[in-house]
């Protein structure tokens, strides 16, 4: 009998949400995603020490300024981990721009190009890389420009429909709407504490975005992210891609039985609305208290982990 992970792969591209190379070898995903928190966790793994040492040595060759060395080594470490992962996945690696740049379009573009150059210098072409940016108005504008220059982007920390619409209209390659973090907010801020998978607010959000994109002929890939249980994952079978943490990949691989496709669109493609303006985007996003809270919290958390990573690097310089 087939297992649920194998069955899921019939309908959806499975991506590993981890920086752990051992997990890549075990579950053989198509792509992999990383973020500052995952890079920080990966940096604690003994096998990665050589990647850290290489990043530090490289940074020392680039500059004599300690602050610049820390920035350079942190960028190089993220790319070094990405390079190791790319040896194991046939598709793409997502590497994230510093979350502290989430409200600065030009700085985000510059950092993205810096990461791309590090990959290119290591022999990796742009078609194997996704640059991750937070789905702020400024991040979406940065992605729009990068896409025009042949740098594909993964827009993350996406919680509102306004964010999803703006990303599609900007022509970004891929979005990562968060499922589990939406569920977390509703459990913490409403009286309802238990949700069946089909009524899980995170699942409902991703389903609505998927239908809207297909209905209007947008090519932006929808990749559900941030799962709390396999029930959420199974309800999104058929989504373009799902990025899944190793613990849930393990649970799916160990669960027997075929699964059914839940997301699909066979209707006609409808005319697209006029592009959302900045003021419309900000107002519509602001009308969703969950999205406002979780976007801000997500940026803060990634920034904290970026700073922890920089402190760890600084101690080695």
UniProtKB/Swiss-Prot annotation:
Function, in words: Transaldolase is important for the balance of metabolites in the pentose-phosphate pathway.
Pathway named in the protein's UniProt entry: Carbohydrate degradation; pentose phosphate pathway; D-glyceraldehyde 3-phosphate and beta-D-fructose 6-phosphate from D-ribose 5-phosphate and D-xylulose 5-phosphate (non-oxidative stage): step 2/3
One GO MF term attached to the UniProt entry: transaldolase activity
Organism annotation: Escherichia coli O6:H1 (strain CFT073 / ATCC 700928 / UPEC)
Main location: cytoplasm
Top EC class for this record: transferase
Alphabetical UniProt keywords: Cytoplasm, Pentose shunt, Schiff base, Transferase
Annotated localization: Cytoplasm
E.C. no: 2.2.1.2
Reaction(s) the record says it catalyses: D-sedoheptulose 7-phosphate + D-glyceraldehyde 3-phosphate = D-erythrose 4-phosphate + beta-D-fructose 6-phosphate
Cross-referenced Pfam families: TAL_FSA
Residue positions of the active site: 132 (schiff-base intermediate with substrate)
Family, as annotated: Belongs to the transaldolase family. Type 1 subfamily.
A single BP term in Gene Ontology: carbohydrate metabolic process
Protein name: Transaldolase B
CDD domains per record: Transaldolase_TalAB
Gene name per UniProt: talB
Matches recorded under InterPro entries: Aldolase_TIM, TAL/FSA, Transaldolase_1, Transaldolase_AS
Top-level division of the source organism's lineage: Bacteria
Subunit text: Homodimer.
A Gene Ontology cellular-component term: cytosol
